[in-house]
C-alpha cells in the first residue's frame, strides 16, 4: 500500500472519528498540499526516519512555515504512521517516532495584527452600510469570539436582559458527504452546506458577559432584521435545522436547510444573527471579501482572527485577570492565552519600565567620584 492511499484510509477511519472537524480539514489540506506530492508515492515499508526527517527539513527551508504549522505537519506524519504501526500492525516500527522539526531560531512570522482604536473606527465606518458585516465585526471585537462562533450565533444565545452571550456551537461548511467544502470553479466561490458544529473544546462552551455598547448595537440590529423580514416578505430567506446522520462518522448532526419564505414544517427555525438584508446566510464566507477591502482599500493587512487577538491583548494590557480572559476566550488552559493571544504592546512595555522606576524611586543613588585625572 502506498503512503498516499494509507493517508486516505487514516483520515476516513481515524481522523474523522477522533479529531475535531476543523482539525481534520486542516490535516486533509496538509496531506494534499505537502505530504502526498513529496512522499505519498512511497510504499509504507519504504518510509524510514532519514527520509521523513529530510522531508520535514525541506518543507521548513522552502516555506519557512510557523512553528505551529510545522507541528501540524509532523502530527499528520507521526499520527498516521503510529496508527499504521501500533493499531494496524502494517509496519514493524514507527519511522516517524524520532523525527523532529528543525530547531532554528527564526524571525517571528506571526501574521497577527493588533488593531488600533483608529483602525477599528475606520473599518466599522467603511462597512456601516453592510449591516451583517458591521455588526459581526463589532461582536468579534467586543467579545473575542472565533469566526465560526460569531457566525454560528443564533438570537436565542443573546440574553439582552442579563447582558450575556452563550457560545454553545459553531458553524462549519461541508459537502453532502460530510467532507471539507469544495471550490466551484465556474462560480468562483466555495460550494457546500452549512452545519452546526461542536465547540473546539469543552471550555469553548461558555457564557460571557457583554457591555452596554454591544447590547445596544445588537438590539438595533435585531430590530432592523425584523423590518427586513416584513420588507422582503415571501422572498426573505429562512433557515431550518434538520437532524441528519453523517455518512462517515455515523453521528447525528444538524444541517441548515434554506427556504424562501416561511415554511409550515416540523423543523425548528434557525434564528441566525448575521445574515444579509434578504436573510441569506453566508456563514464564515461573509467576511472574506470584506478583508480584501480592508487590506487593499484601507491599507490594513489583517484577518478576522485579529479581532480575537486584539480583544485579548487589550484586556491584558488594561489589567484584566489572565484567568478571566482565558475563560472568556474559551481556551483549554491559561498558558494558551499567554502563548498565542497576548502580545507585548508598546503600552505594556512602557508600563513595565514605569513600574520599575516607581519601585526604585526611594533608592538613594550615591554620586560617582570624580577621577583624579579628569579634574
Regions picked out by a protein language model, each given a short descriptive name:
Residues 157-164, 300-301, 320-342:
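Short, polar N-cap/turn motifs at the start of nucleic acid-interacting alpha helices
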Residues 105-107, 114, 171, 329-354:
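Catalytic-site neighborhood detector that most strongly recognizes the C-terminal catalytic loop/helix
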Residues 4, 11-83, 109, 280-286, ...:
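N-terminal core-binding DNA-recognition domain of tyrosine site-specific recombinases/integrases
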Residues 1-45, 50, 226-269:
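N-terminal DNA-binding module of tyrosine recombinases/phage integrases
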Residues 45, 91-93, 103-125, 174-191, ...:
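DNA breakage-rejoining catalytic core of tyrosine-based enzymes
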Residues 162, 169-205, 214, 227-228, ...:
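C-terminal secondary-structure termini that scaffold catalytic or DNA-interacting sites
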Residues 82-95, 120, 140-180:
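Short, charged phosphate-coordinating catalytic segments
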Residues 63, 125, 129-133, 143, ...:
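Short, basic (Lys/Arg/His-rich) helix/loop patches that form interaction surfaces
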Amino acid at each position: 500500500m502506498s503512503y498516499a492511499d494509507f493517508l486516505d484510509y487514516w483520515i476516513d477511519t481515524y481522523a474523522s472519528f477522533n479529531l475535531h472537524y476543523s482539525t481534520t480539514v486542516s490535516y486533509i489540506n496538509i496531506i494534499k498540499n505537502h505530504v502526498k506530492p513529496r512522499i505519498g508515492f512511497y510504499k509504507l515499508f519504504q518510509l524510514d526516519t532519514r527520509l521523513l526527517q529530510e522531508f520535514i527539513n525541506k518543507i521548513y527551508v522552502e516555506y519557512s512555515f510557523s512553528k505551529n504549522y510545522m507541528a501540524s505537519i509532523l502530527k499528520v506524519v507521526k499520527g498516521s504512521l503510529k496508527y499504521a504501526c501500533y493499531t494496524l500492525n502494517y509496519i514493524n516500527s514507527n519511522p516517524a517516532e524520532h523525527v523532529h522539526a528543525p530547531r532554528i531560531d527564526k524571525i517571528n512570522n506571526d501574521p497577527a495584527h493588533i488593531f488600533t482604536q483608529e483602525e477599528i473606527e475606520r473599518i466599522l465606518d467603511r462597512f456601516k452600510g453592510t449591516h451583517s458585516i458591521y455588526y459581526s465585526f463589532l461582536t468579534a471585537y467586543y467579545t473575542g469570539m472565533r469566526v465560526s462562533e460569531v457566525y454560528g450565533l443564533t438570537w436565542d444565545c443573546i440574553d439582552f436582559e442579563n447582558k450575556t452571550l452563550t457560545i454553545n456551537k459553531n458553524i462549519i461548511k461541508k459537502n453532502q458527504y460530510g467532507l471539507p467544502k469544495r471550490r466551484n470553479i465556474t462560480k468562483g466561490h466555495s460550494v457546500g452546506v452549512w452545519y452546526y458544529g461542536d465547540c473546539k473544546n469543552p471550555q469553548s462552551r461558555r457564557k460571557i458577559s457583554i457591555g452596554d455598547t454591544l447590547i445596544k448595537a445588537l438590539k438595533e440590529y435585531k430590530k432592523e432584521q425584523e423590518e427586513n423580514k416584513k420588507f422582503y416578505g415571501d422572498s426573505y430567506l429562512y433557515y431550518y435545522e434538520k437532524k441528519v446522520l453523517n455518512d462517515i462518522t455515523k453521528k447525528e448532526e444538524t444541517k441548515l436547510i434554506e427556504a424562501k419564505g416561511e415554511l409550515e414544517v416540523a423543523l425548528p427555525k434557525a434564528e441566525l444573527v448575521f445574515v444579509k438584508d434578504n436573510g441569506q446566510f453566508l456563514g464564515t464566507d461573509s467576511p472574506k471579501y470584506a478583508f480584501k477591502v480592508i487590506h487593499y482599500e484601507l491599507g490594513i493587512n489583517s484577518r478576522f482572527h485579529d479581532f480575537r487577538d486584539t480583544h485579548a491583548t487589550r484586556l491584558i494590557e488594561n489589567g484584566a485577570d489572565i484567568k478571566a480572559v482565558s475563560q472568556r476566550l474559551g481556551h483549554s488552559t491559561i498558558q494558551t492565552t499567554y502563548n498565542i493571544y497576548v502580545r507585548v504592546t508598546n503600552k505594556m512595555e512602557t508600563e513595565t519600565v514605569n513600574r520599575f522606576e516607581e519601585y526604585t524611586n526611594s533608592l538613594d543613588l550615591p554620586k560617582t567620584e570624580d577621577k583624579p585625572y579628569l579634574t
